[in-house]
Amino acid sequence: FVAINCGAIPLTLMESELFGHEKGAFTDAKETQAGTFERANGGTLFLDEIGELPLDAQVKLLRVLEERKITRIGGKKAIPVNVRIVAATNRNLEEEVRLGKFRLDLLYRLNVFTIQLPPLRERKEDIPLLAAFFLRKHNSLLNLSIESITPEAMDQLCAYDWPGNVRDLENAVQSAMILCVDRQIHSGHLPARIKSYQMERLIAPQEAEEDTSLRDTNSLAEKARILSALQ
């Protein structure tokens, strides 16, 4: 199993990362290197954020999927590969096709079996479980011993919209852990965007109510002026 994040690789290195290169193929190619397709041969290649793949690379990926062969950059020999492809994206690929950012033929080639995973904002019940998992994970990675997240901080995590989904939540928990000086994460340790989001939600209904009240007052005053003029 080999995983690659298509959104994290510079465009200039994308083809080399996927298909490999021969020694001397370009300036920094000091030795031959196998790409992810060769490394995943006989197994599974996970293409994360495939919606970020540039169009030129999409054409070459489609050719590999159809011919089951790759050619390294600077090479002439076609190398057979037998790879199962699993791809993921947070984009609407049908919309990307309409905008000319993703190839329709590649979408059809990949779209054999699809699993739609709802965004994190639509499965709030998962947030406490995921937050606890990330707490354990980063305790180990960062050599920390933070035990829990306070109910108030957890409420703020659950209320947030999470545009970046699970990765966004993990980054927020990790950031809070770095700032935490005791064994509990408090709301003050959370990123500012999460705290400000909560404040905006509290203020918005009040502003809407005040705005409605002001409109009603202005409307009554206008009616009074009209009636006075008619009399």
Language model: regions and residue ranges:
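Bacterial C-terminal helix-turn-helix
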Residues: 208-231
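Intrinsically disordered, low-complexity acidic/proline-/asparagine-rich linker or regulatory tail/stalk regions
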Residues: 18, 205-209
